[in-house]
């Protein structure tokens, strides 16, 4: 019998966190500056097998800037053969997503041998499709808390976000699966303004991007940032050296100390926060706020 479970990490829906997200004292991921809110907490267990997923979001002025999704799977104990088969299907045989090249993916890099998999996927995401009409209809339920937050608080959702997915599992290291999803709103990270807002028509789609040089340049930069994030991810989960991905072809030296360059324009966020404070204090009118906000974002 598969059961829902509340895990001991004590993260709660609505909880605000800063600086880092942690599963354990050892497994912890740095967060960009700002106050992140936990909006998703789910999981299941069966005997010794436990999986937990935590989703957090960064919002400014009622608009989504970024969200992150962390997964830990403790896959030890019994049923090792069945679990190995299930992991292979999860990574490589899922009909809708996985660690294999798809037409909408910009980049897939992986290491795979035996039961070990190290994977990075970079893509653009049609947010409305993902929230309300995903290719895999089962995922509609998974995004329920995201939709609830958006509807209850009138949150503005970007049409397109850039995304990277990072995954590692190896029984030679531990019995734990770790995945991290990064999703960023280009509007807040100096991205070019887009005209097309669906997965297939987006300027970021691999079939279209070469016709849009500004978007190609921006995506190339996002790929480098995603690669640096993945190198940091590999260190956090203690990936074996010979399992680690090679990013030399995109200009990143794996032997150098990794410093993750953030997309975030902290100055822009500060300006928007200061502007909102002036509005809340009655120093400026709503019309003045709207005009000033538009000027900052442009």
Q: Would you name each region that the model predicts?
A:
Residues 259-298:
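Cys/His-rich metal-coordination motifs, chiefly Zn-binding "fingers/knuckles"
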Residues 9-107:
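N-terminal Sec/ER secretory leader and immediately downstream segment
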Residues 63-256:
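Mature extracytoplasmic/lumenal regions of exported proteins
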Residues 23-24, 173, 279:
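Structural motif
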Residues 7-8, 13, 254-262, 268:
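Sec-dependent signal peptide cleavage junction
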Residues 3-5:
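N-terminal signal peptide c-region/cleavage motif recognized by signal peptidases
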Residues 37-40, 231-234, 238, 242, ...:
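Sec-exported extracytoplasmic/periplasmic mature domains
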Residues 7-8, 17, 250, 272:
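Extended hydrophobic/Leu-rich segments
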């Amino acid at each position: 019998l598969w059961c829902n479970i509340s895990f001991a990490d004590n993260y709660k829906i609505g909880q605000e966190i800063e600086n880092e997200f942690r599963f354990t004292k050892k497994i912890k991921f740095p967060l960009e500056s700002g106050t992140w809110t936990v909006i998703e907490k789910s999981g299941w267990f069966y005997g010794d097998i436990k999986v937990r997923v935590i989703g957090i979001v960064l919002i400014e002025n009622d608009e989504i800037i970024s969200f992150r999704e962390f997964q830990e799977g403790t896959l030890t104990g019994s049923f090792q053969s069945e679990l190995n088969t299930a992991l292979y299907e999860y990574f490589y045989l899922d009909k809708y997503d996985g660690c294999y090249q798809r037409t909408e993916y910009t980049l897939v890099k992986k290491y795979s041998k035996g039961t070990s998999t190290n994977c990075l996927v970079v893509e653009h995401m049609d947010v409305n499709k993902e929230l309300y009409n995903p290719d895999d209809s089962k995922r509609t339920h998974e995004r329920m808390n995201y939709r609830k937050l958006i509807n209850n608080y009138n949150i503005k959702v970007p049409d397109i976000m850039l995304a990277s997915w990072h995954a590692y599992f190896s029984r030679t290291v531990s019995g734990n699966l770790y995945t991290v999803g990064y999703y960023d709103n280009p509007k807040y990270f100096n991205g070019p303004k887009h005209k097309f807002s669906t997965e297939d028509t987006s300027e970021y789609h691999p079939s279209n991007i070469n016709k849009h040089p500004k978007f190609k340049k921006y995506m190339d930069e996002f790929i480098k940032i995603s690669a640096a994030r993945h190198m940091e991810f590999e260190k956090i989960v203690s990936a074996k050296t010979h399992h680690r991905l090679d990013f030399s072809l995109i200009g990143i030296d794996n032997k150098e100390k990794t410093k993750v360059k953030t997309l975030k324009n902290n100055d822009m966020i500060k300006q928007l926060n200061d502007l909102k404070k002036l509005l809340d204090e009655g120093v400026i009118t709503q019309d003045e706020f709207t005009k000033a906000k538009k000027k900052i974002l442009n």
